[in-house]
Amino acid sequence: MDKIRNTTAIEYSMDSVAKDLDKNSITVQGWVYSENGEPVLIDVLDENGKSLEYKKRPMPRPDLVRYHLVKAENKNCGFQVKFDGNPEKTYYLLFSTDKEQRKVEIEENNYTALGLFKSYLTHMNAQSIHNAMNYLKQNGVKRFVERVKQGPNLVGYEYQNWFLRQRVKPEELARQSKEQFAYNPKLSIVVATFNTKEEYLKEMIDTVVNQSYSNWELCIADGSTTDAVEKYVKAHYGAYGDKIKFKKLDQNYGISGNTNKALEMADGDYLAVYDHDDVLELDCFYEVVKALQEYRYDTLYTDEDKLNDKYKVFTEPNFKPDYSEDLLRSQNYITHIFFVNRHIYDEVGGYRSEYDGSQDYDYIFRCIEKANAVYHIPRVLYHWRMHPQSTAMDPESKLYCYTAGQRAIESHYKRIGLKDVKVELMPKPYYGFYHTTYSTEPNPLVSILIPNYNLKDTLKTCVDSLYNVNTYKNFEIVIVENNSTDKDIFEYYDMLQKEHDNVKVVTYQGEFNYSKINNFGMKYTKGDYVLLLNNDTEVIEPTAIAEMLGCCLRKEVGAVGAKLLYEDDTVQHAGVVVGFGGYAGHVFTDIDKDDPGILMRPRINCNYSAVTAACMMVKKSVFNEVNGFDEQFEVACNDVDLCLKFREKGYLIVYNAFALWHHYESKSRGYEDTPEKRGSF
């Protein structure tokens, strides 16, 4: 209670401490701020109180703002501090304002009482409360109190509990082992080991040899500086004979070179690269082969999560979408585990050392470019071990990985013939994410189609932004007038057409029907690319139209949506998911515009089933190919239906996170999700 009554204004949380034993460096992540609004300085001290040199960068914490735990001006209260030091010794962070100081020992999950309380609030929900009660019943009060002190960020028990509940059971593994498939491909699992810890080596190999599907081989190429790995494998797994192939390399050829040596040993029908310290689920191979009974996919991938090595629990799941071309160009979301048909490997070759750090990213691109199909197995079957030396714990320590990823994307574009494409790394702290800007050449005419009823000031805001903010100038505006009654709107129409030779106003006489109005207006557009636009929108990002056009020019794309914000700069639209919110709903609504959301999805380009027609660019040829909007959808569902028709024809729907607009739709109205509208859908 003394700690809770502490009158200090400095609140902090030390969320993670990563100690790199090889480089003698320590990285601390957390957050700190003063309740008085004063700036907080950070210093690093050794056990004798001597100040040490360190690198610090601020990290946004929109989650704390979202839960009203800190004020918006404290959004950047997060920090990462990195310094050289002996991981076996004790160090401190010194937090200082003009009025006070707090000296805090560097240890994981070190909180103030209020900091602990606030961290719990950000994780509070019905499931977490249920999990807490179960933990109390199973472990007693004493262990429960100790667990509470460790904080909610310890390992993410909510996911851990879910995963263990749905994990394949021993009886199911036994059944799988007896199942006879019509097609029984040999799976080659290739591993490059390098001074691998015995504990990790055993877990890695055991999760291969205990698979429920038995037609596999494990190919290990060892570039270690000692013969410890070789001795262990031969002593403990010699009985597996040719199923486990081992080669001691005459030198360390680097990650790509060592992996290629392992790939050269493989003679299976499908190949997959497996990291030497990671873990597989025991039904992984079974699920892959089961999928291949339906179709001989050239490439397949699974979901994955992280294995917290300190606490031996699973955390941070990556529930991946089915193959998303734009998402893959924004981040290597596929990663583990990725199976490739041998004929694809024979054609594209193995890893390339010039992409070390993102060698798998480059390899995935080259394989998919040649593949007949990419299949996603929606099960977590791979666990990426997270320990102090891993990239997962301290991304900044391996910045070269991300510049290599940038070059991998650029090489991909060159191979497929996309010219004048610009690839940029996302700014700190979003390492490993990329922004592609596609060329707009030959800069075609874009027709901007705006239905309108009265609301002169609203329409003027929209149109003014098209002329004064937007930088793509080859456009025309077609306004579809529908039953307006205000005199000033007609005066505004006249003024627009006199001042601008690229504005046309046409009149639709019928009652309001969004689909009919847009189908009618489409006939008056001259451009091959049409931006369907609500009158209550406004350009924020000057390159928004160019961003959308660059994507829409790609032959495989049918429609491109934008990132739309409410007036208070929270998200109104960042993609539409069918089945969400009753029938089809906007994702990431109400989060801050800079919030990374889940796996950065609202901040990067990716593919969705649909995007909103409040701001949607379409190829006119594709729009006509599907006969435009279905006019039975008078108000709602028309945009989702249109996008699904595009998808049926094989065209992609792209969400462009960098095409930023305001959409002044009333937040109280929300998306079109009334029972009547769901029934219409």
What are the residue ranges of the model-derived segments?
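Basic, ligand-binding patches in group-transfer machinery
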Residues: 1-135, 139, 180
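N-proximal low-complexity "stem/linker" segments adjacent to membrane-targeting elements
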Residues: 141-207, 414, 418-468
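A conserved acidic beta->alpha catalytic loop
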Residues: 214, 222-232, 251, 481-492
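Glycine-rich, basic loop-to-helix element that forms the pyrophosphate-binding segment
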Residues: 249-266, 508-525
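A recurrent flexible, glycine/aromatic-enriched loop bordering the glycosyltransferase active site
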Residues: 256, 313-343, 515-516, 579-621
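Short aromatic/hydrophobic "clamp" motif used to bind/position activated sugar donors
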Residues: 271, 530
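Conserved donor NDP-sugar-binding/catalytic core segment of glycosyltransferases
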Residues: 279, 283-314, 537-582
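A short, conserved alpha-helix in the catalytic core of glycosyltransferases
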Residues: 344, 354-380, 409, 544-548, ...
